[in-house]
Structure formats: C-alpha cells, structure tokens
C-alpha cells in the first residue's frame, strides 16, 4: 500500500476512533449552563432525532399508556433544552395547572437552598428549634434540640410519625391530623421522639411543613412570595396555585403546589443546569449537588436525598408525588422528563419503567444510529477515496 492510500485510509479510520471515545454531557449540563436559548418565556419544540433520540422508542410510552389505559395525564421529554416529546391525555392540556403532590417537597428543598444562598439561613446544621423560639413544645425530649434542617430535608428527624403506614382515612394518620390542626408547625414539633435524629429514615411530610415555617420565620416572606420572587419569576413560572390550609391559615408545603407540566419541566431543567438559568445562578451549584446525593436507603427500591429520590444503579434523580407526579433529571443524558397522573395506590406505577426502558433506551439507540451512520460513511470513504489516488499514481507512473 503506497503513502497516498495509507494516508487516505488513516483519514477515514480516525473519525471512527474518535466516535467511540466516551463523551458525556453530564458535566456540561450541570456546571456551565451554556445553552443556545433559555425557555423562560417559551419552550422550543424539536424532533427527537435532532437530539439523538429514537422517536420510535419514545412513542412506545404513548402506546403503553393508551393500550393499557394507564391514568397518566401528561408526558414531557426535554432533551438539550428542547421539548422532543409531549403528550396529554384525559382532556388535560399544556395550559392547565396540575397538582404535583409531593413533588412540592423538592421545591421546598430548593427554597431552603436559596434561603441559605441569600444569607437568611446559615447552613443545614442549624437547629430547627432556633427558628421557633416562642413555641412551647409538648412531649419534650432533649433530642428535639438536636434536630437540624438537614434532618428535616432527609426525613431523619427521629420524630414519631405515622403517614404511610396507616390509611389516610384513619384518624391517627399524622398527615391529616396535622392538616386539621390550628398550627401545622406546632403539631409537628409536639410529636414525640421515636429515634435519635439521623438514626432512621421515615417518610414525614410534617418535617417539610417545618421547612416552610423556617423560611417564613427567617426571611419575613410568606412562603408563596418567597418562592415567586426567588425561584418562579427567574425561570419563567408565571402561573401557579398553592393550597391554603383553612384550619391553620398556613400553606400546604409538603404537597400543595399546582403547576403546568411545562413549568415542572422548567424546575427540572434548572437542576439539570446546576442551578443556573440564563447567566443567573438561581440556586448555587453546590446546593444542587449536595441535595441530589442519596443519603438514606428507604427500604424500598429508592434512596433519598434532600427530598429528591434516586434509583440504585442509575444516575438520574427524581421529584416524586402521589398519583404519579414526577420530575426526572437525567444529567448524563441531558434530559428532563415530566409526568402527571391520577394513578390509584393499588395500581402499577410505571413512570420509572418508562424512563429506564423507553427514554434512556431512546437516547442509547439514537446514539447507536449515529454510530452506524458514521461507520457506513467511513467505510464508504475507505472504498471510494483510494480510487482517485490509484488513478493519480497510474497517470504519473
């Protein structure tokens, strides 16, 4: 093989070698925040294939929902900052606000991070009782003095709390007993201790209501006004409602937020970009990182961070709400996925499966399709390009 053919063959093989060097957008998506546009005013829509996703695989989400009559009300997939897949069911539309249930908890986590960034709160090691100096606490236990903000964020306060272990209709269910109380924060602080703080994970919506109280006590804002000024307005969430609990005159911050699905996606996209939005650091990247780490094994399939959930063996994390409200953030794939729904507790909850089986595989298969195209093109060049070289050699030989 002469020099010309060797050079041409090398030029054809090099693209193949480069193509198989593992490259990920995860670090870029979480740190630099460099985007060609920001969906503050409007999301742009683009075909999945333009962002390396296989539309045939994505469409299996719709097939599964419709053929099995799954009570999903909306699905959004955002890739590279563009909506590449969006479906609505059961008369829901993109313009309608939907209950997000306990996804509200992840918004509360973000607001705690912002309150720390803004200097209203020192850090997550601050003691909870320091924010309620005028409260008289029932069932006093010195261990209550050791409950910190971090213990509330990770649901490891040690307070005795019965929410998911007994029916919601049971008068002893603490969630609804709290909603019936004249002061939700007082109700939670009055609960007896069951474990040392940090020793045990137990699902506790009451701790999230205390986080709202901490923000209001520390900032002087109502939780709604604080969220609007420091979180919603900067990322373009201009339509929302928040459940006002009549008995206490307080806002339900463990599950009372209502948002449009596209605004849920904005929140996920903020986290995907490391807290940055259009050159503004809305939440510190440090908070995004620390709050989405997993600190507790919940005893089920999921692990738990600062109100965010994770699945062992996967790099995505999710905000989760009752009846299948979900916000998934997939840093490695540069993707956000949103679901709203009305799935009863006793039914199959399919959204984790949809993300793992369809969304991630759509990205993987889209990438494989790109590889095949490059391989085929490169092989074509290997075959075709040497021909002129051979002709040139013969002409001047």
PLM features: residue spans?
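Structured C-terminal helix/loop/strand segments within mature extracytoplasmic catalytic/sensor domains
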Residues: 316, 321-367
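Active-site helix/loop module of the DD-peptidase/beta-lactamase fold
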Residues: 118-159, 190, 218-254, 259
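Short, charged, amphipathic alpha-helices and their helix-cap/turn boundaries
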Residues: 82-87, 129-130, 166-197, 221-240
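Active-site SXXK
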Residues: 81, 98-124, 152, 211-215, ...
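Secretory targeting signatures
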Residues: 1-31, 366-397
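A short, well-structured edge-of-sheet supersecondary motif
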Residues: 62-92, 327, 334-338
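Active-site Gly/Thr loop motif
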Residues: 238, 288-336
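Active-site-proximal alpha-helical segments within enzyme catalytic domains
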Residues: 207-214, 255-276, 325-341
């Amino acid at each position: 093989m002469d020099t010309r053919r060797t050079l041409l063959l090398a030029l054809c093989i090099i693209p193949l070698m480069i193509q198989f060097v593992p490259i990920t957008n995860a670090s870029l998506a979480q740190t630099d925040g460099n985007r060609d546009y920001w969906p503050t005013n409007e999301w742009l829509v683009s075909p999945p294939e333009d962002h390396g996703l296989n539309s045939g695989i994505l469409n299996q989400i719709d097939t599964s929902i419709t053929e099995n009559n799954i009570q999903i009300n909306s699905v959004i997939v955002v890739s590279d900052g563009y909506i590449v897949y969006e479906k609505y069911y059961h008369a829901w539309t993109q313009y309608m606000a939907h209950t997000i249930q306990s996804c509200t908890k992840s918004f509360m986590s973000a607001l705690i991070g912002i309150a720390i960034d803004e200097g209203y709160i020192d850090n997550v090691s601050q003691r909870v009782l320091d924010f309620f100096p005028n409260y008289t606490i029932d069932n006093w236990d010195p261990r209550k003095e050791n409950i910190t903000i971090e213990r509330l964020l990770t649901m490891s306060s040690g307070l005795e709390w019965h929410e998911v272990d007994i029916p919601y209709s049971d008068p002893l269910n603490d969630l609804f007993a709290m909603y019936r109380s004249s002061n939700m924060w007082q109700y939670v602080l009055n609960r007896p201790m069951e474990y040392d703080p940090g020793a045990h994970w137990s699902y506790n919506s009451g701790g999230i209501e205390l986080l709202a109280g901490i923000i209001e006590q520390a900032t002087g804002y109502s939780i709604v006004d604080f969220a609007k000024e420091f979180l919603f307005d900067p990322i373009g969430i201009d339509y929302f409602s928040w459940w006002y609990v009549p008995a206490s005159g307080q806002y339900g911050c463990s599950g009372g937020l209502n948002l449009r699905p596209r605004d849920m996606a904005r929140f996920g996209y903020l986290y995907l970009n490391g807290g940055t939005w259009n050159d503004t650091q809305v939440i510190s990247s440090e908070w995004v990182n620390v709050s989405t780490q997993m600190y507790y094994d919940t005893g089920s399939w999921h692990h738990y961070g600062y109100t965010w959930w994770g699945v062992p063996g996967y790099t995505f994390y999710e905000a989760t709400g009752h009846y299948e409200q979900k916000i998934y953030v997939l840093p490695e794939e540069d993707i956000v996925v949103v679901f709203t729904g009305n799935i009863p507790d006793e039914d199959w909850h399919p959204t984790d499966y949809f993300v793992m089986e369809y969304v991630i595989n759509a990205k993987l298969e889209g990438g494989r399709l790109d590889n095949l195209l490059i391989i085929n093109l490169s092989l074509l060049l290997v075959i075709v390009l040497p021909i002129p070289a051979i002709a040139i050699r013969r002409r001047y030989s």
